Amino acid sequence: MKTQRIFPGIVLIGFGLYFFLEHSQIEIFPDFYSWPTLLCIVGAAFLIQAYSGNEFESILPGVILLGFGAHFHIVKNLEIWPDNIGIFILIISLGFILRARKTNTGMFHGLILLIISVLFLFYDKITTSFGLVETSTANIERFWPFALMAIGIYFLVRKK
């Protein structure tokens, strides 16, 4: 981090506001005073650092922390919000895509993760739309973890 004052300043302001509201017994929404809120505060600090300090590498951790914190709050309060791994992959892919818009690196990885997250989120609808037979669906479910690992290994060992 080039500018060392923005991130800690935002974190301290956020935590101070969090503890002030907690001690004042002001309830924003149910379960506001829990660890997902702290994730949101740190994630927001990373994003503010990224955009105001022109340190765009902080976009990815900011989106991940803010997104995960928001997810854990939303999943408790909104029944239609999906609670599966697809949401986490979607949040990570959004982080890659937003960072790629500023740094011109990582867009491919973000799009791959976006496709994987959509497959996870809409797997049931996709299989029924294509009319896949139960046995072929079972085979896909059994081998997709290996496909994900193969893609990951490819990213690790490929040379630019």
Describe each PLM feature range:
Residues 1-160:
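Alpha-helical transmembrane segments and their membrane-interface anchoring/capping motifs
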